[in-house]
């Protein structure tokens, strides 16, 4: 997947009510800053000018969020009623989301549930970060749970890494990034949660791979192509398969 440009938006699903895009890494969904001209919103407006809704600030209704650094499936509602039906699915926890990631080190357990509560870091210089309960300066930690399933052990630029499937069972800011870091396996390229050490990869290796939203009118079920394959990035070399991606996704349904 190449870096985002104004005219290379990738569409995974489209109906009269919804569009699901494959968001590029290092791309904001929207921005009020005049100098940030390339956003997902501007890509959508360029590709679908006739679908922009003048009654909304950004022109499009984003059903959920993805971090600036995270790529993958993101759902956009094309009208108010569709947005409401998607919002209800998220509120009622009917949505299934699964992410692919490369994490540092070889994860020894084939599966794990990570249940650290996560709060906002109020320490000076770290106020843009989240943290697990018990960290100095951790404010208002809330219960969080993530499932981690090991897919492959391998290496990235010669260093040991593990390819994992991550399923957030709650929806806290930076949850997957914080949880991976908290168990000693930060996401490859995550500068923020690697004590500002991991700066050499070209991107953070976190990708929203699978999204299922069972709205009353239609079932949205998409996969955003896996970017963590050797044909896409020769720095990643898988050595040993632990779980099949296809079988693991089938278990989520």
Name each region found by the language model:
Residues 54-92:
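Glycine/acidic-rich beta-strand-loop module
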Residues 76-78, 102-104, 167:
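Short hydrophobic/aromatic beta-strand micro-patches
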Residues 27-46, 103-162, 178, 221-223, ...:
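Glycine- and acidic-residue-rich catalytic/RNA-contacting loop of pseudouridine synthases
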């Amino acid at each position: 997947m190449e870096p985002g440009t104004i005219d290379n938006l990738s569409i995974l699903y489209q109906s009269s009510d919804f569009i699901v895009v494959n968001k590029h890494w290092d791309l904001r969904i929207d921005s009020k800053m005049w100098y940030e001209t390339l956003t997902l919103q501007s890509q959508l407006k360029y590709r679908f000018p006739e679908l922009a809704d003048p009654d909304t600030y950004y022109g499009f209704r984003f059903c959920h969020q993805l971090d600036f650094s995270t790529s993958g499936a993101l759902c956009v509602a094309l009208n108010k009623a569709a947005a409401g039906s998607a919002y209800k699915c998220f509120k009622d926890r009917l949505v299934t989301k699964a992410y692919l990631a490369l994490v540092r080190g070889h994860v020894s357990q084939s599966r794990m549930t990570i249940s650290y509560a996560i709060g906002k870091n109020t320490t000076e210089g770290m106020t843009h970060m989240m943290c697990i309960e018990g960290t100095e300066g951790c404010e208002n930690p809330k219960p969080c749970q993530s499932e981690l399933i090991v897919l492959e052990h391998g290496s990235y630029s010669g260093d040991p890494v593990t390819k994992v499937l991550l399923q957030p069972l709650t929806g806290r800011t930076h949850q997957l990034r914080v949880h991976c870091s908290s168990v000693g396996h930060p996401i490859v390229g995550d500068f923020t949660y690697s004590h500002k050490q991991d700066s050499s990869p070209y991107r953070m290796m976190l990708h929203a791979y699978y999204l299922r939203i069972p709205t009353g009118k239609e079932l949205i079920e998409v996969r955003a192509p896996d970017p963590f394959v050797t044909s896409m990035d020769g720095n990643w070399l898988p050595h040993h398969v632990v779980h099949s991606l296809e079988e693991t996704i089938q278990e989520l349904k």
